[in-house]
């Protein structure tokens, strides 16, 4: 399934070294590698991962 593989379509990084990157994708769940997932109480929920990493995951959508 899509949720099991860590991926991100919209990733923002700072210009620092190492970069601080955050995935801004919003979906019904967060990817499997996400440690800090924040969801709204709406239905369906809108979740995003608030983890900060030094890299971006591969894009979820194959364009």
UniProtKB/Swiss-Prot annotation:
Stable at low pH. SUPFAM superfamilies: Bowman-Birk inhibitor, BBI (SSF57247). It holds the Pfam family Bowman-Birk_leg. Keywords: Disulfide bond, Protease inhibitor, Serine protease inhibitor. Belongs to the Bowman-Birk serine protease inhibitor family. PROSITE patterns: BOWMAN_BIRK. It comes from Lupinus albus (White lupine). Disulfide bonds join 7-60, 8-23, 11-56, 13-21, 30-37, 34-49, 39-47. Thermostable. The keyword Glycosyltransferase does not apply. The record marks 15-16, 41-42 as: Reactive bond for trypsin. It comes from the Eukaryota. Monomer. Coiled coil: none annotated. Inhibits trypsin stoichiometrically at the molar ratio of 1:2, with a dissociation constant of 4.2 nM. Does not inhibit chymotrypsin. One of its GO terms (molecular function) is serine-type endopeptidase inhibitor activity. GO terms for cellular component: extracellular region. This is Bowman-Birk type proteinase inhibitor. The keyword Amino-acid biosynthesis does not apply.
């Amino acid at each position: 399934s899509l949720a099991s593989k860590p991926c991100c379509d919209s990733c923002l990084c700072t210009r620092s070294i190492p970069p601080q990157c955050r995935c801004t994708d919003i979906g019904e769940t967060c990817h499997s590698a996400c440690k800090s997932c924040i969801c709204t109480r709406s239905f369906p929920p809108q979740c995003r991962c608030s983890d900060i990493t030094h890299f971006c995951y591969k894009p979820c959508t194959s364009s």
